[in-house]
Each structure stands twice: as C-alpha cells, then as structure tokens.
A protein has these predicted regions:
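N-terminal acidic leader/helix
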Residues: 2-33
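Generic alpha-helical propensity signal that fires on short helical segments
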Residues: 22-25, 39-41, 52-56
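Generic structural hydrophobic/aromatic packing signal, biased to beta-strands
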Residues: 16, 36-38, 70
Length: 78
C-alpha cells in the first residue's frame, strides 16, 4: 500500500476532486467512517502539501459541486 494515499478528510477529498484527482476506492470502517484512497503521484503530493499550508485556490462552484458529488456517493453506497 505504499503507493496509496488514504484520507477521511472530506474537505481535502473535495479539494482534490476539484483539482481533477480521481480516487480509486472508498472504504467504510465499522464506525461508518469513510476513507478515500488515491494513487500517490507527484501532483497529488503537491496538492496535499499546498492544501495543508493553505496555499490553494479553488473555484467555489467547482468545490461545491465536488462536495455534493462526494456526499451523493457516500450516502447512496451505504
């Protein structure tokens, strides 16, 4: 699993989705926590670092669409 980045941070996932990063898998834990899995690459690592440092700008409508899209996936695949 070295080449897989996993996160349950919904806003990070929405940000990455807004930047056209595709997740490979969604895992559900026993406590209903959802974990998104991405293939690691340089572009993903840069986006995550910039997100953590508050250096990203995302178009608001694209971010809102990503949130809605992800919530639909989460709640329709229970």
């Amino acid at each position: 699993m070295k080449n897989i980045f996993q996160t349950s941070d919904f806003n990070l996932v929405a940000t990455l989705h807004s930047l056209n990063h595709k997740f490979n898998e969604i895992k559900r834990e026993d406590n209903n926590k959802v974990i998104f899995c991405f293939t690691k690459n340089t572009h993903l690592s840069v986006a995550i670092r910039k997100y953590q440092q508050g250096e990203l700008c995302i178009e608001p409508q694209k971010f809102a669409y990503s949130q809605k899209f992800l919530k639909t996936i989460i709640y329709n695949n229970r």
